[in-house]
Amino acid sequence: MTGLLAAGLLAPFFFEATPEVRTSYVSLGKLMEDRPMQVTYARFGYDTETFGRFGIRNWDVSSLTGRRSDAHNHAFYHTEVGPTWQYDLDLADDWALKSDLTRSWTFYRRFNSAYAASNKTYNWWQLDQSLANPYLVPFYRIRKCFRGNDYTYFMAGVRRRFGLPWSLYTTPSVFVYGGSSRNLRRTLGPRPDGEPWTAGVSAITFRLEAGWSLNENLSAFMFVEQYDIVGQGHRHANARSSYRCAHNDWTLGGIGLRLKF
């Protein structure tokens, strides 16, 4: 009842937020930080029902530990903000093609990272799609970055949610990261032979999430992930990288809340 009242107060507007604490931070397929980070996602908008949901999204990342002087002189890492459009195309009972189109700007300030632009603002388009169904859900994300960080990034995988007693659930998933030659250079560093990277997959992640849904508006979750660079050449280059978080294999986890109104 409380959830229905909260949703009714906002309708036809909506608000979503996911505050998290992560032991490490993977950004666009690259292990950017191997220390604890705070990540917050938020979205506010208007649900037209017929033509989808229009809104504004925000993504903030901050450090929970002291900064290393080679990378930061403040805790703030970066923020993203921009308009979004979401639309669900019903295909059959319990089947739907879910789309999420985003136009965003990423703001970095006083950030120094090997093989990546820093201390600037760049913009990008991103499309997320998934085929919701009762069985195995395939999903993908593709992002095209502009203004100094001109590269294409993608993520693709599958997941399955299992309901458990007492409003508990678990969701295993597996997905790969990859992109254009420039994105692989950003992820792995330069090729040892000096040639451009061939576009493709650079890493894979195995994820297991478990959570508890109090109601339709609030759930708590925890997760663990195994992140691995794939390909002998990729692993060799990443192992030689001077970047302080260039681990070929890394286990990370986190906890968080999901709020929807």
Please state what every model-predicted region is.
Residues M1-E16, C245:
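Cleavable N-terminal export/targeting peptides
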Residues L10-D70, W85, L252, R258-K260:
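Short glycine/proline- and aromatic-enriched beta-strand/turn motifs that initiate or cap beta-hairpins
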Residues F15, E49-I56, A92-S99, N133-Y140, ...:
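Repeated loop/turn-to-beta-strand initiation elements of outer-membrane beta-barrel proteins
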Residues P19-T23, T40-Y46, P83-L89, L101-R103, ...:
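Residues on the lipid-exposed face of transmembrane beta-strands in outer-membrane beta-barrel proteins
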Residues V21-S27, T48, N58-G66, L89, ...:
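Transmembrane beta-strands of outer-membrane beta-barrel pores
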Residues N58-G157, H236, R240-C245, T251:
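Outer-membrane pore/translocation modules
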Residues S118-I204, E209:
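Detector for outer-membrane/organellar transmembrane beta-barrel domains
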Residues I204-F261:
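Predominantly the C-terminal beta-signal and adjacent terminal strand-loop region
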